[in-house]
């Protein structure tokens, strides 16, 4: 009898472990096409679709935690969440904890954009006393010396879409965005009103990292991400939202 009870308990524990969700973290400053947040819950977007497909292929439920950007890394360190995507190791110089990184999955391409693109590209250092649309809390290494010496001024918004909305209505002449967001934003505008890239500020490969914990199916997650990248699934999801051919790392 005790053997039977023990066997049932072992089965129950293993079923519970198999059903444990993978907890993904998202920053509340993200906007489309990365993710659409409705009342604090993700409903669509590139990263939402990728995370949902990843969990399905791993065979576990997906659980989404939407947090202020400043709390994201702390949540990883304290074991409140398991997976963070769209990050680079260079963004986390003081990262503490045991993590395993995926291969590069995306190309982060930061652009300086304007309402009317001039005939030639702009050198940011040539700009004087301009307000630049930026996202609150984001760091822009190429522009930081110009912000520090007062040559340029930041004008922060809560997320990338708000930054571009303000540019479109003329709050400032230039803003920083990434290629995904620019492609998404321009899809809703007539050709004559579309925002134009005037400088490439930075290109960087980014991926996901997973908390290295026995309770987390780390290797299954990493293998699945590799398969999704190699099969073209990730690039197909990007193209679905941006309408553009993705730039592969």
Stretches found by the model and what they are:
Residues 18-97, 134, 156, 221, ...:
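Extracytoplasmic small-molecule ligand-binding "clamshell" domains
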Residues 61-68, 152-166, 199:
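Short beta-strand-to-loop elements that line the ligand-binding cleft
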């Amino acid at each position: 009898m005790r053997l039977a009870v023990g066997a049932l308990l072992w089965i129950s524990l293993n079923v519970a472990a198999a059903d444990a969700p993978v907890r993904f973290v998202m920053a509340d400053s993200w906007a489309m096409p990365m993710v659409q947040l409705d009342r604090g819950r993700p409903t669509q977007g590139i990263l939402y679709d990728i995370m949902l497909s990843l969990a399905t292929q791993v065979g576990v439920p997906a659980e989404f935690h939407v947090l202020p950007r400043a709390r994201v890394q702390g949540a990883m360190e304290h074991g409140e969440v398991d997976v963070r995507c769209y990050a680079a190791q260079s963004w986390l110089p003081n990262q503490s904890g045991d993590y395993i990184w995926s291969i590069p999955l995306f190309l982060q391409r930061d652009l300086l954009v304007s309402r009317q693109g001039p005939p030639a590209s702009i050198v940011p250092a040539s700009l004087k006393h301009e307000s630049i649309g930026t996202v609150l809390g984001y760091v822009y290494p190429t522009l930081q010396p110009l912000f520090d010496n007062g040559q340029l001024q930041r004008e922060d918004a809560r997320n990338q879409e708000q930054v571009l909305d303000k540019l479109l209505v003329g709050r400032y002449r230039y803003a920083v965005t990434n290629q995904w967001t620019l492609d998404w934003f321009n899809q809703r505008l007539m050709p004559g009103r579309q925002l134009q890239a005037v400088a490439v500020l930075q290109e960087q490969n980014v991926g996901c990292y997973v908390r290295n914990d026995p309770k987390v199916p780390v290797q299954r997650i990493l293998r699945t991400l590799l398969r999704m990248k190699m099969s073209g699934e990730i690039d197909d999801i990007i193209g679905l939202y941006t309408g553009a051919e993705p730039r592969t790392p």
